[in-house]
Amino acid sequence: MKRVLIIHGPNVNLTGKREKEVYGDINYEEINNLIKREAAKLDIAVKIQQSNSEGEIINLIHSAENNFDAIIINPAAYTHYSLAIMDAIAAVSVPVIEVHISNIFGREDYRKTSVTASKCKGVITGFGPYSYVLALNAVKLLEDSIGG
């Protein structure tokens, strides 16, 4: 069974309460339940973490080495400027998939840049909470394609 670390960045814990026109009505607990259901279907074990702190997110990324087979991360606002998170992603050997609930390329100009994406295996953006579902399926497809 593959093990995947899910990292929710700042303010993701407020999903369903803030900016519903951008992030939708689904709340944080419902997103996590959706992730757990899809992971079970795919025979993937998930550990779900959320942090509003850049340093804690970096520590979570570092902890994935030798403990997880992949990381799915929503860096949230850190996407646009955190070179430290980008460097942490580059420092681990496990594949990292970046996800976003909203389509960052359809939003404000300052949100159209992802400094973290360049070190990720891929990016899934704009599919609401299903961005996480698609990312879990991508992990499974990667596993199947490399025989691991």
From Swiss-Prot:
This is 3-dehydroquinate dehydratase. The active site is at Y23 (proton acceptor), H100 (proton donor). CDD domains: DHQase_II. Its EC number is 4.2.1.10. Substrate binds at N74, H80, D87, I101, S102, R111. Pathway: Metabolic intermediate biosynthesis; chorismate biosynthesis; chorismate from D-erythrose 4-phosphate and phosphoenolpyruvate: step 3/7. One of its GO terms (biological process) is quinate catabolic process. It catalyses: 3-dehydroquinate = 3-dehydroshikimate + H2O. One of its GO terms (molecular function) is 3-dehydroquinate dehydratase activity. Signal peptide: none annotated. It comes from Thermoanaerobacter pseudethanolicus (strain ATCC 33223 / 39E) (Clostridium thermohydrosulfuricum). Belongs to the type-II 3-dehydroquinase family. The keyword Lyase applies. It is an enzyme of class 4 (lyase). It comes from the Bacteria.
